[in-house]
Amino acid sequence: MATSKLQALWNHPAGPKTIHFWAPTFKWGISIANIADFQKPPETLSYPQQIVITGTGLVWSRYSTVITPKNWNLFSVSLGMAVTGIYQLTRKIKHDYVYEANSIVAKE
């Protein structure tokens, strides 16, 4: 039974014999790096980088569900990229607009 499931995975159109498996698998590195950046101070985050990570995640999440065969590996990594990008953008916006505004009011 396990052998037949492994054989089905191996021969799948988006299986390990194709770029459709390996590209999303290596794309996890971007999401992992973005998660590692959760520890960085928000002032070091880049708006353009996080906007691109979020946008890429959203676009490819949608694409991965409309292609045939559906590529769930691509969907999951893209969703992860979108979520981590949104989180980082939220941190950056809070730092730049909420905390900065509060510190200006406190100084006055």
UniProtKB/Swiss-Prot annotation:
Gene: MPC3
UniProt source species: Arabidopsis thaliana (Mouse-ear cress)
UniProt-recorded name of the protein: Mitochondrial pyruvate carrier 3
GO BP of this protein: mitochondrial pyruvate transmembrane transport; negative regulation of anion channel activity; negative regulation of potassium ion transmembrane transporter activity; regulation of response to water deprivation
Alphabetical UniProt keywords: Membrane, Mitochondrion, Mitochondrion inner membrane, Transmembrane, Transmembrane helix, Transport
InterPro entries reported in the protein's UniProt record: MPC (IPR005336)
Annotated membrane topology: Multi-pass membrane protein
Tissue-specificity statement: Abundant in leaf and particularly in the guard cells.
UniProt note: phenotype after gene disruption: Abscisic acid (ABA) hypersensitivity of stomatal movements and enhanced drought tolerance.
Compartmental location: Mitochondrion; Mitochondrion inner membrane
Record-stated family: Belongs to the mitochondrial pyruvate carrier (MPC) (TC 2.A.105) family.
UniProt cross-references to Pfam families, sorted A to Z: MPC (PF03650)
Inducing or repressing factors: By abscisic acid (ABA) and drought stress.
GO CC, any one term: mitochondrial inner membrane
Sequence intervals crossing the membrane: 19-35, 51-67, 74-90
Coiled-coil blocks: none
Major localization listed first in the record, in broad terms: mitochondrion
Function: Mediates the uptake of pyruvate into mitochondria. Negatively regulates ABA-induced guard cell signaling and mediates drought stress responses.
